[in-house]
Amino acid sequence: MTDLRHYDVIVSPAITEKSTLLSDNNQVVFNVAKTATKPEIKAAVEALFGVKVTAVNTLLRLGKTKRFKGLVGKQKDVKKAIVTLAEGQSIDVSTGL
């Protein structure tokens, strides 16, 4: 049985035009918790999906400042992880966990 904290590390798959292009290179993009480290992300992906991870790259997208009817607000910051899988392995992110 998978450890429940793995579900706290991986928030959701990031399904965008760029992330679908990365699937040609055996890479998958996930939104992850801001406090998640690369070893935690690697362990979570390997445990939840049963694949071998070769590399994890992370980035922090800062939220934009938005205005609506004169009020200033801010979007949330999002941490993304680009996970490189071993050759011949893949993850279908369109299905749920």
Swiss-Prot record:
Keywords in alphabetical order: Ribonucleoprotein, Ribosomal protein, RNA-binding, rRNA-binding
Database matches in InterPro entries: Nucleotide-bd_a/b_plait_sf (IPR012677), Ribosomal_uL23-like (IPR013025), Ribosomal_uL23/eL15/eS24_sf (IPR012678)
Pfam family membership, one: Ribosomal_L23
Subunit structure and binding partners: Part of the 50S ribosomal subunit. Contacts protein L29, and trigger factor when it is bound to the ribosome.
NCBIfam families: PRK05738.1-3, PRK05738.1-5, PRK05738.2-4
Family membership: Belongs to the universal ribosomal protein uL23 family.
Protein name: Large ribosomal subunit protein uL23
Gene, per the UniProt record: rplW
